[in-house]
């Protein structure tokens, strides 16, 4: 049985947070759909809030503390990423972006990604397509077409809102699972040979 490794990144700040709640539901739906397709699934959930100090220190020291280094290694070893951020000032949170910035620029290349966002008003739902998706496109990920936004009406006793959210989650998880079913083992990039500057110039000019 093939195994698919998924890292879930939740950038929620509260305990509990709506971002974590959405992340858990997305992960559970993806696990169900992959299991139905015959895959074993390993899920690692990361609360970025717990790494906030280590992330900040990494920027000024260039050193990743053991806990942060372990999470980075887990992300790099994953087949897929579920990334959920709260919305602040019409974009993803600073904590979320800071974690992405400490990763190697090629760490997410080729990985399947499922995006989610939460906010206190529906006015922020476009953040998925105007902020988060461009970020992951730049990082060359394979991002599910459907991203999931959850606002206040999607939680609590509103049955209609909860049903609509569940439908969006199942659709997005299905697309994500489809990307993971086609995932290939990630190959390390070929090591580039470092040549003397004079030799590089000679190659450009055609001289031996």
Predicted region positions:
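Generic secondary-structure signature for well-ordered alpha-helical cores
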Residues: 31-36, 137, 141, 174-185
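Helix-loop-strand module that forms the ligand-binding subsite of alpha/beta enzymes
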Residues: 63-139
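A generic structural signal for short coil/turn motifs at secondary-structure boundaries
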Residues: 15-17, 122-125, 156-157
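Hydrophobic alpha-helical membrane-association signature
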Residues: 22-26, 128, 172
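A short small-residue
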Residues: 2-10, 112, 148-157
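Glycine-rich phosphate/pyrophosphate-binding loop and the adjoining helix
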Residues: 145-208
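Mobile beta-alpha loop/short-helix "lid" or hinge segments that flank ligand
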Residues: 44-53, 138-156
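N-terminal beta1-alpha1-beta2 submodule of the flavodoxin-like/Rossmannoid cofactor-binding fold
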Residues: 1-84, 90-97, 191-208
